[in-house]
């Protein structure tokens, strides 16, 4: 079942917290600490290595939270299709697949038998043009991102993961009805760390983002719940104030 329509998000579901922790115990501590400030959680590779990944997925679902499985699958089409077929049995809202191979993405969409929405990873926000050149791709990141977004759209994917810096170009190329989820969000006084193509909250939504993924700016805050609530307020303002 090709579920290529965008996921309908409530206004407080547009802030996705990156639950990048090494254990279920720490995951539950963060879920309890953030409370109603966060309704959508991304769980990735670090938790997978703990052996407690699907317990955390169940923990989130039982608390009424949306789940984003961020494992960035990249393999031959048959293998990725098999994984997606199994994941379709779980209460997952978003799941990522690398956007480097159109047949792999199409196989994944055809294997999806649930309301899970598949997102293509375009170019990691930790990568620069120089990084792409070292991989033999001598092009601007935005051009590669748009090309992969178009391929994902043609393959029936629901949307993409991309820097907010490229969201406007994606929206111009594809239009509405295609989800753009943006990591690499940085607020004032928060180090960029390994993120390169970063953007602020207001700019990301102005460029056409549907949702943002935030990890360290919340985890590193003196009061993480207050930081998350402040971001929710900024998102609401960005989505409701008239554009200039």
From Swiss-Prot:
Q: Which organism is it from?
A: Xylella fastidiosa (strain Temecula1 / ATCC 700964)
Quaternary arrangement and interactors, per the entry? Answer: Homodimer.
Recorded GO CC terms: cytosol
Q: Some GO term, biological process aspect, for this entry: which one?
A: 'de novo' pyrimidine nucleobase biosynthetic process
What keywords tag this UniProt record?
Decarboxylase, Lyase, Pyrimidine biosynthesis
- Please state the pathway this protein functions in, per its UniProt record: Pyrimidine metabolism; UMP biosynthesis via de novo pathway; UMP from orotate: step 2/2
Catalytic activity reads: orotidine 5'-phosphate + H(+) = UMP + CO2
Sequence intervals crossing the membrane: none
| Binding positions (substrate) | 20, 42, 70-79, 125, 186, 195, 215-216
Enzyme Commission number(s): 4.1.1.23
Q: Does the keyword Lyase apply?
A: yes
**What does this gene product do?**
Catalyzes the decarboxylation of orotidine 5'-monophosphate (OMP) to uridine 5'-monophosphate (UMP).
Family designation? Belongs to the OMP decarboxylase family. Type 1 subfamily.
Which Gene3D superfamilies does the UniProt record give? Answer: Aldolase class I
Q: Which GO terms describe its molecular function?
A: orotidine-5'-phosphate decarboxylase activity
Top EC class for this record: lyase
Q: Where is the active site?
A: 72 (proton donor)
Q: What is this protein called?
A: Orotidine 5'-phosphate decarboxylase
Pfam family membership, one: OMPdecase
Q: Check the record and name the InterPro entries matching this protein.
A: Aldolase_TIM (IPR013785), OMPdecase (IPR014732), OMPdecase_AS (IPR018089), OMPdecase_bac (IPR047596), OMPdeCOase_dom (IPR001754), RibuloseP-bd_barrel (IPR011060)
Q: Out of the domains of life, which is the source?
A: Bacteria
């Amino acid at each position: 079942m090709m579920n290529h329509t965008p996921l309908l998000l409530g206004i407080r579901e547009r802030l996705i917290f990156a639950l990048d922790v090494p254990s279920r115990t720490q995951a539950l501590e963060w879920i309890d600490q953030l409370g109603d400030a966060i309704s959508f959680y991304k769980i990735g590779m670090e938790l997978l290595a703990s052996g407690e990944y699907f317990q955390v997925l169940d923990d989130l679902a039982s608390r009424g939270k949306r789940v984003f499985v961020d494992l960035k699958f990249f393999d031959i089409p048959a293998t990725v299709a098999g994984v997606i077929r199994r994941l379709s049995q779980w209460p997952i809202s978003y799941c990522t697949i690398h956007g480097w191979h159109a047949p792999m993405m199409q196989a994944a969409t055809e294997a999806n038998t649930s309301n899970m929405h598949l997102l293509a990873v375009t170019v990691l926000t930790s990568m620069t043009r120089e990084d792409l050149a070292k991989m033999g791709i001598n092009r601007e990141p935005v051009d590669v991102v748009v090309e992969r977004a178009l391929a994902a759209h043609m393959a029936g994917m629901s949307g993409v993961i991309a820097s907010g810096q490229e969201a406007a170009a994606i929206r111009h190329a594809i239009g509405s009805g295609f989800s753009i989820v943006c990591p690499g969000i940085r607020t004032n006084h928060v180090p960029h760390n390994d993120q390169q193509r970063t953007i602020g909250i207001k700019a990301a939504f102005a460029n056409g983002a549907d949702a943002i993924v935030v990890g360290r700016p919340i985890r590193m805050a003196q009061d993480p719940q207050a930081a998350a609530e402040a971001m929710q307020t900024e998102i609401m303002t960005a989505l409701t104030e008239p554009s200039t």
